[in-house]
Amino acid sequence: MANPEVLVSSCRARQDESPCTFHPSSSPSEQLLLEDQMRRKLKFFFMNPCEKFWARGRKPWKLAIQILKIAMVTIQLVLFGLSNQMVVAFKEENTIAFKHLFLKGYMDRMDDTYAVYTQSEVYDQIIFAVTQYLQLQNISVGNHAYENKGTKQSAMAICQHFYRQGTICPGNDTFDIDPEVETECFLVEPDEASHLGTPGENKLNLSLDFHRLLTVELQFKLKAINLQTVRHQELPDCYDFTLTITFDNKAHSGRIKISLDNDISIKECKDWHVSGSIQKNTHYMMIFDAFVILTCLASLVLCARSVIRGLQLQQEFVNFFLLHYKKEVSASDQMEFINGWYIMIIISDILTIVGSVLKMEIQAKSLTSYDVCSILLGTSTMLVWLGVIRYLGFFAKYNLLILTLQAALPNVMRFCCCAAMIYLGYCFCGWIVLGPYHEKFRSLNRVSECLFSLINGDDMFSTFAKMQQKSYLVWLFSRVYLYSFISLFIYMILSLFIALITDTYETIKHYQQDGFPETELRKFIAECKDLPNSGKYRLEDDPPGSLLCCCKK
């Protein structure tokens, strides 16, 4: 039989490179030595970074990179957020300015109520918008301009959509309608010097048949440059605004709603020059973004390597357990080798890398995908901060939240599935029955938002008070509907949900005091009594452990 000390040393020296092969014909002593080697290998795998340092002197590179990455990604997000705020503010302020410029008598927060009720008001509104468009250069306080198409400037398109044929006689309760929709359009050039008079004198040659009319649309394009970014050491962007003023008569109710939609696109300015050091600052920011990408790549490689090693060790342990004990490893034990925190960090690294590349392209004015970039960077930063919880979980006093969430998650998911069925039932019922009589129930999305607010105790009285009383039956139903929903979800479902979390929390606290239930995997590892600083985990080429370590317990 081989010398036991030699066999142990051989297995220990190569335990991170290739697995020790187990043969059923091995002698009992060799089998015990192989079991001991497997236990040490598993115990080292599940150690925290501090214990691994004491076991083999391995530096916690992943932890150091995560700390560095948190600082860098957060700084990057803040800088991009400030830039994105200027972009969003410029869009919103221009949209408000256009509404005041092109909608006659418009006042702030009138979007839902802005409408006209007479034919003369419709003509007045159209003529007012056209006149303002033709005089834009003289009246606008912004740097707005017409879009140039070659030597000419883009025109305003006025289109009306109407039924092909229609004879409507409400007095006789008769009508003859052809639902086929036709469209007529004509253009108004910015360089036209024509005078637009009163509706009876207007030279637009626009005639509307209000009985057949569906919509009138005024569409035109304007351009502007966001100069406020210069003060923040950034290159300005050029904006294209596609404006559409819509007169909506689809309901034929005597009320024509007017709305202004602004479709905004950001483009790279063609010919620009800025004095000063703005371009140099842009280069510094791109260098910083490149450093963020390199840091995330290092984190990605280290975490991916750890995940792969975990899968390899999982397969090795499954084979070992099957050959040695003639038993299969349970699925829960196999899942312990898959570190979900590493997978989350890998996802955050990928999002950060893609977002940083987009940010660099935006700074170079090659792309203008601010919204996509903000979603990527925002999500990645959130995941980076969540990933740090893993390292706090190594301390018994800080991992209570993590353990509670992990233990409660399966029951919470099952509970939420059942509660969601009741919630959706109330959503559909409220939308169908109360939608015509209550503004908060006009769409499924608004119904869901309203009911979720009620669960949290928000806006209860106004939800009751705003219910129209035109139909006593529906009003009575609304009371039964709202009272039953509030009672069911607040006093029963929400209380049960909180009790579910509380029960799990108490169970975890009990486990921390008396010990957690041990699985087959943990029982197998627990038979290894070697401490991390015993020296038995060290490989032949490992450096001696430093006596100075902040992780010493």
Curated annotation (Swiss-Prot):
Intramembrane residue numbers: 444-464
Cysteine pairings via disulfide bonds: C159-C185, C238-C269
Catalytic activity field: Ca(2+)(in) = Ca(2+)(out); Mg(2+)(in) = Mg(2+)(out); K(+)(in) = K(+)(out); Na(+)(in) = Na(+)(out)
Cytoplasmic compartment residues: 1-62, 305-341, 393-414, 498-553
Keyword Cell inner membrane attached: no
Any one GO MF annotation of this record: sodium channel activity
Transmembrane annotation, as ranges: 63-83, 284-304, 342-362, 372-392, 415-435, 476-497
GO biological process entries: inner ear auditory receptor cell differentiation; locomotory behavior
Domain of life according to the entry: Eukaryota
PTM statement from Swiss-Prot or TrEMBL: N-glycosylated.
Regulation: Channel activity is activated by PtdIns(3,5)P2 (phosphatidylinositol 3,5-bisphosphate). Inhibited by lumenal H(+) and Na(+). The channel pore shows dynamic behavior and undergoes spontaneous, Ca(2+)-dependent modulation when conducting Ca(2+).
Description of its domains: The most N-terminal extracellular/lumenal domain (referred to as I-II linker or polycystin-mucolipin domain) contributes to a structure with a four-fold rotational symmetry in a tetrameric assembly; the structure contains a central highly electronegative pore with a 14 A diameter. The pore is critical for Ca(2+) and pH regulation. The protruding structure formed by the I-II linkers may contain all the interaction sites with lipids and proteins in the endolysosomal lumen.
Protein name: Mucolipin-3
Organism whose genome encodes this protein: Mus musculus
Upper taxonomic lineage: Eukaryota, Metazoa, Chordata, Craniata, Vertebrata
